[in-house]
Amino acid sequence: MAGSVPWAASRRLWGWVPSACRSFSLGVPRLAFVRLTLPPPKVVDRWNEKRALFGVYDNIGILGNFEKHPKELIKGPVWLRGWRGNELQRCVRKKKFVGNRMFIEDLHNLNKRISYLYKHFNRHGKYR
């Protein structure tokens, strides 16, 4: 039949119309998406190292007379302590901090990664 809309498409189109405006029923709603049983509970180790040490330095200011900032207690590379950002920003920051002391091959690989990420962030994503 020319000009007719298939049944499934018409059902989808009527899905946009509120049920109060419809003059007929679309049938019994499907129960395919209704979960009949509860999912099994996840087994979680509540005392792993990360959870056990959570908030351990929260009161460092009170007990330490406010001489140290918690970011000074973080162990890791100097260019990452107390700093947040995406991978491109992290690589640029690493190059700025230790680029002159890196081996040639490592610096070359870092420059390649920065080049790739720069192209990627400019071609993909929400803010391009």
Swiss-Prot record:
Pfam families: MRP-L51. It is found in: Mitochondrion. The keyword Ribosomal protein applies. Residues 1-31 form a transit peptide. Signal peptide: none annotated. Disulfide bonds: none annotated. GO terms for molecular function: structural constituent of ribosome. The keyword Ribonucleoprotein applies. Component of the mitochondrial ribosome large subunit (39S) which comprises a 16S rRNA and about 50 distinct proteins. Interacts with OXA1L. This is Large ribosomal subunit protein mL51. The gene is Mrpl51.
